[in-house]
Each structure stands twice: as C-alpha cells, then as structure tokens.
C-alpha cells in the first residue's frame, strides 16, 4: 500500500511507492475475505489469486474471529473459504505507531504471529522475509526463480528482534494507563447506561464500525434476476436490522 495508507494494486512502475513497516492501512483485511457487497455465485471472480502485503498484526489476529464463524466445521462458507485460500498473506512488523494503537493491551504483539504466510521487515534498505506456512515457502521458491535471496546473518536477525522489542516497549509505555483486556467485561458491566447514551447521541447508524470490525459477521443475502445472489454485510446498528416479513420488528 502507498502513501494514501490504503491497500493498492502493485504495478511495475509503482513498486517504489510501497511503504514498509508502517501502521495499519485504513482498509481492513476483512474486506478482502468478506466484502461489503459481493455476488456469491461468481465463481470465476473468487478463484482469482492474489498477494496481500503489509498486513499489521492486529488485523491478522482479528481474522481468528472471522474464521471461527465462516470456517466452522458445522458449515464452511464456500465463498469465504475460496477468498482465504486464494490469498497469500504477508504480514508486516510495525516500526511506527499511530495515535490509537493499543494492540499490546489485548495480548497482541506489534509484529505478526499468526494467520499469515510470510512476514516482511525492512531495516536499512534491506528487505527481510520470514516464511510462516507451506504456502509461504512455495511462494519463496517461485521468487527464487527470478531473483537471488540470501540468508540473514545472526546480527541482522538480532537487529530485527531488537526493533520489535523496542516498538513493543514503546507501546506498553504509551498505553500503561489502559486496563488489562481481561478486565474489559467487568468494566462494561459496571459502566452503567450513561456512557452508552453519550456515544449513541452522535451515532447515525451508518454501520461503518461494523463493516471494518472483524467481530461483526452478520450479512443479508439478496436474490436478484439472472440467478444473481448478492451478499451484503449487515449490522445491528441499522434501523431495519430486526425487521422480518411484512415489515414487523419483534424487538419493538
């Protein structure tokens, strides 16, 4: 992704625009596997291969929730599974922080640990790749057909580890006044209604928070002419979320 801090398609003439090890882009990883709107019977589209590079650790960890819902043994969502399987995920170490970064308070490190195929790090104009899956190893083997790769020295590996440690310590200092995530449930239960009333006053039910958050997995399936089945992300903030046949709302 480029200077706009959005994922962008990499072309030969835009390779130099890639920003490495920067905080997360505005586009969540979720939208690649569960788009806001998609035709779920368009098999050709879902069979396209792609590489998603520069994914922060927080987004990779959030994928656990989506996988738990859409790859559950009881029923595996075929569209979501194809989107996942046809993607090579390259996670990125975070070397700088944004104002609201607080992954460590949730037990997440500022460098990839799960749900990715490779990790990318940039130190002193040298790109380091670490394989984390069989898919990642196969991709490295393909890359070696076109360019030379070298094993890092022990000092280079230590430099990467030192940078990770420094960023993690900076995050811990920055968020030292935040509560432990294990206490979040108790804090919510004891907060009362006033705080929810305060924030609901400015909510316009746009559903943007649900669209980007990996904990929100609801969708609505619409059937259109020509055997087109369109899945839309749904959200409990939408005024019509609870409506059923004939426009009835059982929660009112």
Walk through the language-model features, giving the residues of each.
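Local cysteine-cluster metal-coordination motifs and their immediate loop/turn environment
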Residues: 56-61, 104, 201-220, 231-241
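Iron-sulfur-associated redox domains of electron-transfer enzymes in respiratory
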Residues: 1-187, 191-196, 214
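A sequence-composition feature that detects small, non-aromatic residues
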Residues: 26, 166, 208-211, 235, ...
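Ferredoxin-type iron-sulfur electron-transfer modules in oxidoreductases and energy-metabolism complexes
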Residues: 177-201, 219-252
